[in-house]
Structures are given as C-alpha cells and as structure tokens.
Amino acid sequence: MSIFGRIKRLFLSPKSHEVALVLGGGGARGIAHIGAIEALEERGYVIHSVTGTSIGALVGGLWAAGKMKELKDIVLKLNKKEVLSLMDISIGLNHLMSGEKLLTVFDQLVGDRKIEDLPVNFCCSASDLVSGKETVFRRGSLKMAMRASISIPCFFKPVRFHRHIYVDGGVHNTLPLNRVARIKGDWLFAVNASAPDRRFAPAFVSKIRKHREGKFGKFLDSISFHN
C-alpha cells in the first residue's frame, strides 16, 4: 500500500480513537495547530492528552481549557490594527515587548485555572535561563505556563516565575515528543509548524542565514538576560 493509502486508512478507519497530541513551535505558522485539532475531532478522534511548546503551548493550553472557539474567533478577526494593539513595546536589554497585554488576554480567557484541573492531560515546556535546562509545566497556573513557553528570546521579556527566568520552550525542544502522556493503544500525532529543513532551502536563503548566524549570532550571545 502506498504512503497516501496508509494515511487515508489512518484517518478514515481508526482502530483506536484515543490520541496523544504534540504541538510544536513555529511562530505564526503554529496557527495551523487549530486546523489540525479540528481535523482530528471531525474524524472522530478523542484527544486524551496534549503537549505543546511555544505557539503549540498556547493553542494546546487553550484547547484543553475549552477555549478553542474563542481562540479561533480572535485569530479570524486579527488585522493589522489588532496585531499592533497586542504589541506592548517596552524595549529593554533583553526584549522588545513586555508581553503584559498577552498575559491580560490569557487572563480573560482562562483566569486562574490550574493545569491539574483541566479535563484532559496537558503540559507545556519552557527554557529555564537559570539552570539552562528545559522545564515542563504539569501543575500550577495555566496562563503563566503558556506565557513562559511563548517568550521568544529578544522579542518578549523573559518570565520571572517561581524564582526562575523562562524563555520560549522551543529553544530546548521544538517538538516535545518525549513529554506527552501516553496510554496503551493510543495514536501519537505530532504537528511540526517549524521552518522546513534548511538542507532544502534555496542557495540565497542559505547565504542570508550564514550572514545572520555570524554577526547576529554574536550579538545574541552578548545579551545578558536580566532586568
């Protein structure tokens, strides 16, 4: 059977409807996670656990909290003016935006909900600048966990939370396959919205990356993450 035939059979005739879902990073491309979740649900799959990082943590967390419709409405209504309204410019040594407006939106959507109180198993990851390791949030404030996981270095202000300083989870683990909760007989679905493999990029793109990784990379290395 061809690969396309296998994929068709997978989606149309599932032997098990239980799914463990992993949503990776990818910036704005991660909005595709919304469509992936809808496609699974339309085909009768039941997502029993979801793990995400960066934009995947945002989409996965809001889905787990039952706020997918609200998230989709926000995305569909986004225009240039709406995007600019969320950009709270606050230039510092380590960031361009404070991220407080995003946190306000999260608060409006999920309030003080705890991860352990969600109806499905959810976790997300962030990168700890103090220990230099990946941190996985399985308990505690959902909105703070999501905010920490999407803190793109140099764009959003790092999050100080429980005596740690966090930035985007994708720094350590772009697609956290090793963090998702599994049950016997379930399907594992992973959605990778990150940039394509650079080996297949056009030659001029490779030249741009080489230049950026030289000078810009040294600039990033010189930045100290502190207030």
Role assignments for model-derived ranges:
Residues 107, 144-158, 169-176:
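Active-site glycine-rich loop that binds ribose-phosphate moieties when present
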Residues 35-43, 65-70, 140-143:
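A glycine- and small-aliphatic-rich helix-loop capping segment at beta-alpha/alpha-beta transitions
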Residues 26, 36, 56, 124, ...:
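Conserved small-residue
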Residues 1-50:
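Helix-rich "cap/lid" substructures immediately adjacent to catalytic or cofactor-binding pockets
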Residues 83, 110-121:
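A short alpha-helix-loop-beta-strand transition element characteristic
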Residues 2, 15-19, 68-105, 127-141, ...:
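Non-catalytic peripheral regions of patatin-like phospholipases
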Residues 33, 46-64, 173:
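Catalytic nucleophile loop
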